[in-house]
Amino acid sequence: MWRIKIAEGGKDPYLYSTNNYVGRQTWEFDPDAGTPEERAEVEEARQNFYKNRYQVKPCGDLLWRLQFLGEKNFEQTIPQVRIEEGEGITYEKATRALRRTVQFFSALQASDGHWPAEIAGPLFFLPPLVMCVYITGHLDAVFPAEHRKEILRYIYYHQNEDGGWGLHIEGHSTMFCTALNYICMRIIGEGPNGGQDDACARARKWIHDHGSVTNIPSWGKTWLSILGVYDWSGSNPMPPEFWMLPSFLPMHPAKMWCYCRMVYMPMSYLYGKRFVGPITPLIQQLREELFTQPYDQINWKKTRHQCAPEDLYYPHPFVQDLIWDCLYIFTEPLLTRWPLNEIIRKKALEVTMKHIHYEDESSRYITIGCVEKVLCMLACWVEDPNGDYFKKHLARIPDYIWVAEDGMKMQSFGSQEWDTGFAIQALLATNLTDEIGDVLRRGHDFIKKSQVRDNPSGDFKSMYRHISKGSWTFSDQDHGWQVSDCTAEGLKCCLLFSMMPPEIVGEHMVPERLYDSVNVLLSLQSKNGGLSAWEPAGAQEWLELLNPTEFFADIVIEHEYVECTSSAIHALVLFKKLYPGHRKKEIDNFIVNAVRYLESIQTSDGGWYGNWGVCFTYGTWFALGGLAAAGKTYNNCLAMRKAVDFLLRIQRDNGGWGESYLSCPEKRYVPLEGNRSNLVHTAWALMALIHAGQMDRDPTPLHRAARLMINSQLEDGDFPQQEITGVFMKNCMLHYAAYRNIYPLWALAEYRRRVPLPS
């Protein structure tokens, strides 16, 4: 039986931590664990997911929940609440519904104070890891039999009805993910016609019907070339010399978005080496299975710009293809021949590997994310198969693995700090401190222990890094990468706790550490007033024309985001109230400029585009929260009035809100089909309207939304899992499994606290 382990490092000599692994979450299989009843419960969860997999595609993340609830002997003791049609919501009923969800959610807190949860959904995360450990000869060690069983379960359970796999679990089938998951099944041990429900045969048919893997997008071409089932001459160049360019050039690594930089860093190393894994009998078979013409007759040069229409979200402009062609025809032949291969290419590979090692060490070998992790790990193995660098990477693979009723998947990297920051604010909003003091103390302890205490090591600016001291990451302290909105939410939590008695919530954070957080936030504001996420924005927008991916948008440079800007306003307004003498003028200017930015990016229909959640509902919740924190109201702010009109206009017949993930790639509001509502979207919209003072004008829309949430609460105090709610880079969705608890809880808390209700 699978069990989650919290804040454990084990005895691996290649594993180390900055804070004794606080926030770390890993899974292990224990064949002796669990009672027959517990095992039956897990199996029932798997079967229920499989039966409903085409209706609700994100999992309920039930395995660890069942484990925690069992370990704590949880039993819901508060009677369920039902609000009938036409019945008003009393303060007593709102309180009872709120206490039920607080009681349930508190039982899900881990021993170190955070709330574990899946953050996955993209279907291109796991297959490259399987390919990597296959190439390096570590497949059996990393993924023994029970792991393989769960990997296959995940692949089977998320195969679309047409035989393919989408970019993410709710998406239409794409060549990229269909090819990767087909290869993954074959490596794990399925035959060409094997797999549940004829998975392999159906997938291969989809691939052939859509032109074969010559139509796979560029990242797929890279991975297939590495594996040996594609030829490097069919890929566009990724010269490692890029890492030696002078800093005055507009296209320089320091000016790239950090994730883009970190993906193409190891990719360029592997490309520069033209590395190809061992050509095993399986690789020979895949060369026959994945193409519609003989492998040795393919004109690889012609395949470089090919991309299946199903995968194409960002068509490359002509100027970009022209650049690739020039590099391919003129530059690469020179750099790969003597003497330039010895004078320049060799040096470029050394410089690139120096950057890889620096980033690995700075993140305790977690790296910035799962795509980068696997590429950096493979690059370290290519450099030295028996070296410590690779062994340190192996030790951190468990940090990325997650198991649920739909199988084993690879996480983006973990959302421990992000989820916990919002969970704490939701619980604080309940005003039930007397009932959850221990929960709050543990959460406070986790937040304090998760703050990044130092900048990256050495001359970090020469390695294109920004200050991180005082920040919070998205996941845990070991990850090391500062994020502005995570920092703002962490700071806000610490400030809120500082206003409470330490005998209840524990020792307050010292002011100097709060000042460090403020330094990070102030350093990330752009000239337009907006806040970037990881590093200062400011590179020229035209560089996005060089976006080398086909299925993402806005990935080349750092941008400003409504969510980051709003979170920072919230935090700095509260900080200014508690510490009025610290950098007052700078903070005042920050807030004024940030508000101006929010008002400037509002869409014509009154919403804000959400960059990290679905979509206009999410962005509008953040924006209205930021505006309200800065003193804007419905009466003195046109943007707020337009936003209220927008939200009221899209409220569904049942009182909720429901937005399709298609809003994200299409950049326009798209409702869920069938007049459906989503409880997370409903919570965001409800809180947004409360920020805008809707209760002072007409509380009816708020009552209708609260009624839907109360009546949707399950018997144990949980809420049902519905559609996917997270997104990144416009076109790829993320499943934040904790959202279904955090946001309805928070919305009910704000509703009970701020909307007048009869006793």
Swiss-Prot record:
Pathway: Terpene metabolism. PFTB repeats lie at residues 148-189, 514-559, 591-631, 640-681. Keywords: Isomerase, Repeat. Belongs to the terpene cyclase/mutase family. GO terms for cellular component: lipid droplet. Pfam families: SQHop_cyclase_C, SQHop_cyclase_N. Oxidosqualene cyclase that specifically catalyzes the biosynthesis of beta-amyrin. One of its GO terms (biological process) is triterpenoid biosynthetic process. It is an enzyme of class 5 (isomerase). GO terms for molecular function: beta-amyrin synthase activity. InterPro entries: SQ_cyclase_C (IPR032696), SQ_cyclase_N (IPR032697), Squalene_cyclase (IPR018333), Terpenoid_cyclase/PrenylTrfase (IPR008930). This is Beta-amyrin synthase. Disulfide bonds: none annotated. Its EC number is 5.4.99.39. It catalyses: (S)-2,3-epoxysqualene = beta-amyrin. The gene is BAS. Gene3D superfamilies: 1.50.10.20. The active site is at D485 (proton donor).
